[in-house]
């Protein structure tokens, strides 16, 4: 069975724009706001949202990317290192963090990202933005900003394509 495209380029751009407007509304602009993208695709989505925030509000929002590999609960022997050098690490203490990822599924990636954020500082607030929420949560985690809810079967997968890596913007259900 072929993959089914559920978001094309235009739909993906509209979803990111909607998320951006919701972030502006919730945060009353961009004061004390930091966008944190979960590597790899969340990082690129965070940078795009920051660009839109600058276009709409005229403010530059800091963006940081985090690698949560060492905070995953299926790798208990890891040593909780973010792999960031001091130039890449932003001061997130007392900041309003918007954590950004491409797909929300079981919630385990987000749990690991929360652990990673707390490891480097004490944010004032943390909210979650995802391009796609596909359901099937294993942990009590809910996104504050969702581009598109796409219910899937347990055996299906969601594949997000971003221009920066894949040469196109799209979301597909993989059977």
Swiss-Prot record:
GO terms for biological process: DNA-templated transcription termination. The keyword Disulfide bond does not apply. GO terms for molecular function: RNA binding; uracil phosphoribosyltransferase activity. A motif (PRPP-binding) lies at residues 97-109. Gene3D superfamilies: 3.40.50.2020. Keywords: Glycosyltransferase, RNA-binding, Transcription, Transcription regulation, Transcription termination, Transferase. Its EC number is 2.4.2.9. Coiled coil: none annotated. InterPro entries: PRibTrfase_dom, PRTase-like, PyrR, PyrR_bifunctional. Pfam families: Pribosyltran. It catalyses: UMP + diphosphate = 5-phospho-alpha-D-ribose 1-diphosphate + uracil. Belongs to the purine/pyrimidine phosphoribosyltransferase family. PyrR subfamily. Regulates transcriptional attenuation of the pyrimidine nucleotide (pyr) operon by binding in a uridine-dependent manner to specific sites on pyr mRNA. This disrupts an antiterminator hairpin in the RNA and favors formation of a downstream transcription terminator, leading to a reduced expression of downstream genes. Also displays a weak uracil phosphoribosyltransferase activity which is not physiologically significant. Homodimer and homohexamer; in equilibrium. This is Bifunctional protein PyrR. The gene is pyrR.
């Amino acid at each position: 069975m072929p993959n089914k495209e559920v978001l094309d380029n235009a739909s993906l751009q509209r979803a990111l724009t909607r998320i951006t407007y919701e972030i502006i509304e919730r945060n009353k602009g961009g004061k004390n706001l930091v966008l944190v993208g979960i590597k790899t695709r969340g990082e690129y989505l965070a940078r795009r949202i920051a660009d839109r925030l600058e276009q709409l509000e005229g403010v530059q929002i800091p963006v940081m990317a985090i690698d949560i590999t060492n905070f995953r609960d299926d790798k208990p022997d890891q040593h909780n290192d973010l792999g960031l050098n001091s130039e890449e690490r932003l001061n997130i203490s007392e900041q309003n963090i918007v954590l950004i990822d491409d797909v929300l599924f079981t919630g385990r990636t987000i749990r690991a990202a929360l652990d990673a954020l707390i490891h480097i500082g004490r944010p004032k607030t943390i909210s979650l933005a995802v391009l796609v929420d596909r359901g099937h949560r294993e942990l009590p985690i809910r996104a504050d900003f969702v581009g598109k809810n796409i219910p899937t079967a347990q055996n299906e997968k969601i594949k997000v394509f971003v221009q920066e890596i894949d040469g196109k913007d799209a979301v597909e259900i993989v059977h």
